[in-house]
Amino acid sequence: MREPKDTIDAVRPQIPASLILVAPRVNSGGVGDYAEDFIAAAIPYFPRFREIRTGGPGDVRLLDLFRYRAQLAAEIEKAALEGGVVVHFELSAASVAPFWLLAGCSPHVITSATVHDPPRAVWWPFRVNAVAMRKWLHHGIHLPLRLMSNGLEQWALRNTTLFALSNVGARSLQDTFPGCRVLSARHFVPTKAALKPVFDRPLAIGLYGHAAKGKGFERLVELRAALPADVHVVVAGRGTERLPPVPGVSILGAVEGPEEDVFFESVRAILLPYDKTSRFYGKMLPASGVASRAFAYGTPVLGFDSGTLGEAAKAGGLIAVPNSVQELARETYRVITDQAELERMESEIGELQKEQSVRKVVMPFVSFWREAVDERQHNK
């Protein structure tokens, strides 16, 4: 149990309840890392805080689910002795443990969830590690059971308020879960080291993030060929060390701490040639944690105009282009060789760093939790 520490404002009325977080572990994927900064900003609003950290995508056994559920029930029981209880879940496509803990959560507590991959909460609810290790088994289970899975999600989330990290994501969630209250929030821009101005960095672009399907790494050869030879390409992120070598591309693998600072200072822009559409399962609408990471380092972003990137481009710091590698390469070269354009985007990013700080982004969640706790107390 972490002790709440007020690190945001000097004085504020706290919400009279315990907050319990259910999320994947730190370093198990982007959602677990996101939860660490997010919950640190939320803790000071509560007098008591507990957390249950689970295995990440593909790293949860069936027995783990029973253990986590028993742990959550025990934490809720202890917290209820001290007053109201709010349980917040971080849900994503392949993080099955938080979903199954939510499905078994007591209806007598207030539940909320950040849904990272709208329009569904968990796309593959049976993807425990034994299933994740066998692609044929994964699809053999989930494809035939899509309709049942959809109904299971609607039942599990029926008493839960859902948050999406974009407006387009919130609209899609409302269509999928018409019985749920859905609220729109934003992905925060974390605080990172100040780097040199973008135009003073090497003439290079970066691809960053977990090397998962749909994240653009499969377009690396095509992208390298489309960019002028004087533009270097640098790739970093968990799992990228397993990518096949490509001439003219530096592949770094995972970078943490000072290594991450060095990576971002070695590129003038981050590219997001994302395509999160599956012909079998449909289109995902995640907010880009990689874009927020790039903004933290004052780095412009260019990507395909798909999913949530078109909406994000309206806020600045990001340019969305048609879903063409050739078009992305042309626009990227124009931007990274134009000092005035880079300075304009840097200025926009500076505003985003202030407007989408974690302290501000957490406020819609805090407002809902306060309202829900007050309503429960009033109805007693």
What do these predicted regions represent?
Residues 76-97, 109-114:
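Short N-terminal targeting/anchoring amphipathic segment
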Residues 30, 323-325, 340-370:
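A charged, aromatic-enriched C-terminal amphipathic alpha-helix characteristic of glycosyltransferases
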Residues 272-292, 296, 303-311:
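Nucleotide-sugar-dependent
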Residues 196-215, 221-224:
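Conserved donor-binding/catalytic core segment of Leloir-type glycosyltransferases
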Residues 168-169, 178, 184-194, 240, ...:
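Short beta-strand->alpha-helix junction loop in the catalytic core
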Residues 315-326, 333-340:
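Conserved acidic donor-binding segment of nucleotide-sugar-dependent glycosyltransferases
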Residues 240-264, 268-269:
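Nucleotide-activated donor-binding/catalytic signature segment of Leloir-type glycosyltransferases, i.e.
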